[in-house]
Amino acid sequence: MVTLAELLVLLAALLATASGYFVSIDAHAEECFFERVTSGTKMGLIFEVAEGGFLDIDVEITGPDNKGIYKGDRESSGKYTFAAHMDGTYKFCFSNRMSTMTPKIVMFTIDIGEAPKGQDMETEAHQNKLEEMINELAVAMTAVKHEQEYMEVRERIHRAINDNTNSRVVLWSFFEALVLVAMTLGQIYYLKRFFEVRRVV
């Protein structure tokens, strides 16, 4: 019989396979991250550009044989899942080479699934329904975590847009007030001079 402590340790181990990061990528720079996996392992990349420029980044996933698995240009966010076609180190790169001066902040998560099991272990796993339920729960919790991180980044982006719009509206209002005061003073001065009585000596 599996104890509650063993279940919690198994759940924590399953959740530990997904790591979320924030990375700053300078203009004309590229940042790469590497994961070593066995053939058949399911992998996934979820990313979102949080700050910088037009919120776009170039993304590339390369296999151990330097074969391109995925390439995206000027993407703001994305999700890509694939199965490793061979044993080795897979490379996940974010490139900001198209930007002339703006650094980008990218939030990303690389999900690494479980390595495929042998035939004997697979039948044993089917017999253990509790382990399957824990795996499903771990996947669901990871999905909720990713969605929460995504919403947090979107909220930060929208707050920055709102703050920027608010500051522009306030500055424009001050400018309009100054123009209104200047026009009022000009009209008072003009009317005052218009009604002045000029004396001829």
From Swiss-Prot:
Keywords noted in UniProt: Coiled coil, Cytoplasmic vesicle, Endoplasmic reticulum, ER-Golgi transport, Golgi apparatus, Membrane, Protein transport, Signal, Transmembrane, Transmembrane helix, Transport
Membrane topology per record: Single-pass type I membrane protein
Subcellular location as annotated: Cytoplasmic vesicle membrane; Cytoplasmic vesicle, COPI-coated vesicle membrane; Golgi apparatus, cis-Golgi network membrane; Golgi apparatus, Golgi stack membrane
PROSITE patterns for this protein: GOLD
Topology Lumenal: residue spans: 21-168
Record region (Interaction with F2RL1): 1-181
Sequence ranges assigned to domain GOLD in this UniProt record: 30-112
The protein's assembly and partners: Monomer and homodimer in the endoplasmic reticulum, endoplasmic reticulum-Golgi intermediate compartment and Golgi. Probably oligomerizes with other members of the EMP24/GP25L family such as TMED7, TMED9 and TMED10. Interacts (via GOLD domain) with TMED10 (via GOLD domain). Associates with the COPI vesicle coat (coatomer); TMED10:TMED2 heterotetramers are proposed to be involved in coatomer association. Interacts (via C-terminus) with COPG1; the interaction involves dimeric TMED2. Interacts with SEC23A; indicative for an association of TMED2 with the COPII vesicle coat.
Protein name, entry field: Transmembrane emp24 domain-containing protein 2
Provenance organism: Rattus norvegicus
Gene behind the chain: Tmed2
